Amino acid sequence: MARVKTGVVRRRRHKKVLKLARGFYSGRRKHFRKAKEQLERSLVYAYRDRRRKKRDFRRLWIVRINAACRLNDISYSKFINGLKKAGIELDRKILADLAMNDAAAFAKIADAAKKAL
């Protein structure tokens, strides 16, 4: 029985890893072992940050809404409470967009929240 060498399989495996490592810096792009180690780390970071991105954007939206609320003489927590009592169901993403791009509309919503309190 002939001896099976890993030539083709190894080359395919190395090419796959090195293709995914494009854009990495220096030897982490060119050397298989370093590229493989960095790729494993990169995939861990990507997995973690796909979950973290949701939290980060929510925090950003809250900061923007809070800043706009302060301009309209109401705190963020009272604003959100007023929205719930007024029956206004806008999520934080939409509210943050209004706060940044349409201050007049946000002011009307803030007034409605104040009246509901």
From Swiss-Prot:
GO terms for biological process: ribosomal large subunit assembly; translation. The keyword Iron does not apply. GO terms for molecular function: rRNA binding; structural constituent of ribosome. GO terms for cellular component: ribonucleoprotein complex; ribosome. Keywords: Ribonucleoprotein, Ribosomal protein, RNA-binding, rRNA-binding. Pfam families: Ribosomal_L20 (PF00453). It comes from the Bacteria. Binds directly to 23S ribosomal RNA and is necessary for the in vitro assembly process of the 50S ribosomal subunit. It is not involved in the protein synthesizing functions of that subunit. Belongs to the bacterial ribosomal protein bL20 family. This is Large ribosomal subunit protein bL20. It comes from Campylobacter lari (strain RM2100 / D67 / ATCC BAA-1060).
